[in-house]
């Protein structure tokens, strides 16, 4: 984007899906159900950003931490602030790894490179500095805190790790823009407490090509991340 852009989107809030593979493989989900609710009008403002795909910063495997309470991760994006409550007690390994990536500035100036917006699912995927869908740190870690529910197990606002198979978590994660049912293969590590409307508006504006899966039409970049 070359100038500040205001987005107004009518966003469908609830979806159902089955067997969606959310990872660095650009495989589109198969629609299995129609939208069942409407959330109304969403408006956000996105500023110009110089962020672009780049080589990942080399980061060693972070040390495991012991947490007495949840952490708060704030994504400062060109479209506004997204605040995430990180489930440090339910997903201590994941939050430890993310803490290391955040403090190492691994995510700074990275683009949210992929979205899905279909009758099956609505999500925004981020966390790959290369913006190719194949980037990540030099380490991987195991799954944890997988959902037990069979339906609507990834509600709107859920933040979970993307992967390429069991126990292959790295840095990429996705934020659910609508209530969705997925196979329970993706570590849930947080929920958005502020700024979900940003994700919803970006997702509702679709992909650059107009297809259900691909690079967002609206460029959204994580310019800086903090954790406390």
Model-derived regions: residue spans:
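Compositionally biased regions
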Residues: 3-4, 18-20, 24
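Bacterial N-terminal signal peptides that target proteins for export
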Residues: 1-11
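Bacterial N-terminal signal peptides
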Residues: 11-19
């Amino acid at each position: 984007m070359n100038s500040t852009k205001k987005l107004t989107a009518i966003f469908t809030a609830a979806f159902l899906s089955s067997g969606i593979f959310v990872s660095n493989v650009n495989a589109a989900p198969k629609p299995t159900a129609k939208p069942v609710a409407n959330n109304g009008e969403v408006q956000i403002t996105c500023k110009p950003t110089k962020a672009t795909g780049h080589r990942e910063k080399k980061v060693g495997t972070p040390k495991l931490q012991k947490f007495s309470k949840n952490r708060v991760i704030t994504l400062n994006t060109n479209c506004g602030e997204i605040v995430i409550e990180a489930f440090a007690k339910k997903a201590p390994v994941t939050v430890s790894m993310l803490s290391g990536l955040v403090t190492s500035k691994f995510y700074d100036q990275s683009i949210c490179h992929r979205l899905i917006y279909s009758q099956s699912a609505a999500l925004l995927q981020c966390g790959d500095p290369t913006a190719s869908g194949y980037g990540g740190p030099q380490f991987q870690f195991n799954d944890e805190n997988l959902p037990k529910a069979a339906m609507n197990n990834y509600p709107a606002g859920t933040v979970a790790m993307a992967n390429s198979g069991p126990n292959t978590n790295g840095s990429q994660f996705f934020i659910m823009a609508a209530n969705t049912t997925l196979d329970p293969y993706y570590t849930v590590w947080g929920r958005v407490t502020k700024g979900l409307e940003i994700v919803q508006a970006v997702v509702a504006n679709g992909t650059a090509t107009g297809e259900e899966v691909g690079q967002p039409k609206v460029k959204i970049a994580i310019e800086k991340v903090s954790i406390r």
